[in-house]
Amino acid sequence: MVVDNKATITYVQLLKEDLVIMRLVPNDGLVPEYQAGQFITIGLPNPTEDNKIVRRAYSIASHPENRKYIELVIRWVRKPIPGRLTTQLFNAKVGDEISWIKPTGSALSINEKLPDGSKDERRIVCIGGGTGLAPFVSFAQHLHAVGDKREIIVLHGASYVDELSYKDLLTDLEYDSLDRGKDKWNFKYRASISRPQEWFNRSWGGQTGRVETFLRPKGGGFSPLEEQIGDKITKDNTIFYVCGWQGTIDGVMDFMKPRGFVTQHDKRADGSFEVKYESYG
């Protein structure tokens, strides 16, 4: 039997008409335990369905060390049919009550051990398409909070510059890396805009195209990602985490499969793999 807990919406930041950051605080004041990369299922009674609770899972953008609230970034997809729950969420306001079920999910858990039991010290590359960035915002804040020394790169793809939902937070984390030194905190954040020709994106001077174009080799044989880190990506030195629509997952694997990278679903006989992913469509 599903047990719904109750929480109150304490913060709403409307980034644009169809993109919002929302914070929830459980009514008992106790933020549930969870791991970076997990999702939480929330719900609201739908008045058009006899107040039946309509639920949906969302990746958590806040990090486990934050015991004040759960933060989500939510897209309102209105075509071809508006989402039943997201439509209600975009009409919700601070003070409204919402149901939730404890966080779960292991698809994007941070890999800490190699198959032989040794510590996984590979470079971490996180690729998020749209709101698929959320688990990696949690990753970045968590790894920063615990003082992880691994090299971490977060790549975000969006259609428009105002959809770079955590640009300021992630840029600040990169500045902290520059200030403290890479031996203490080694972090980079880069974004790509897929519609640079649109008037609204006229000021954008960064990477263009879908987020997986960071992996496409250029004339010299290095990809934009490899140029950023100053190193060649190999199976031994890098693990990828990917979240977004299935097209994003497929796009990443189109570049990585020819290089011998395999996913956790197709791991080798010895248990090794280089790509973990979660698709939400």
Label each region the model flagged:
Residues 10, 21-125, 194, 271-281:
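FAD-binding FR-type
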Residues 60, 135-147:
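Histidine-anchored nucleotide/phosphate-binding helix
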Residues 129-134:
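Ser/Thr-glycine-rich phosphate-binding loops at phosphate-binding pockets of nucleotides
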